[in-house]
Amino acid sequence: RACGLPQAPLDDLAAFHVIFGKTVPDVSLNAVANLGYAQGRWRAQVYAGDTLRSSSEVIGLKENSSRTSGVVYVRTRGTNQRGEIVMDYVRWVMVRKRDAEAAAPETVVPELKRALTVADLAIPAGLTFAKYDFAQAGEPHRLGDYAVGEVIDHVDGVTIEEAEHMMATRLWQNTAKVHFDATFREDGRR
């Protein structure tokens, strides 16, 4: 609240994964590969108790040279219970063709920005860091503490086991087969 927000918002990546997870059954449940993301914007804060929904628009299609698969480009919008867009992003996914002999769709590859501009970003109304307590947050480093080319060794590594991988994907409601079925991939890996 000291930062001008009504309460602590959910972590942005938690909100992203919930919105992303809702798209999996319709976009990438049986994907060969999730290829990339672009133009991701968090446009409004998400708070505990919000209801999130996702909708995706197909904005591009391209058959691969193998003619057995292709790339689908989608723009996904996540909204809250008030219909406010809380985030949007573009992603592209490689999927198999239903019929390898089917004619290729018209190729449409969307033009995507290489990077977002400051004008593309949304700053929550009322947000201020004038009273933010950096010491209480446990983060002593500021912009002037870093240098270009500096290497930071993050010593606290962690091993993610299969059970944790599956638990995380279930938590975010990501039902893509590759996360749960070791027989889905030819190499037997997830």
Please provide the spans of the model-predicted regions.
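Hot-dog-fold acyl-thioester-processing enzymes
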Residues: R1-Y37, R98-R190
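HotDog/MaoC-like acyl-thioester-processing domains
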Residues: A44-D133, L143
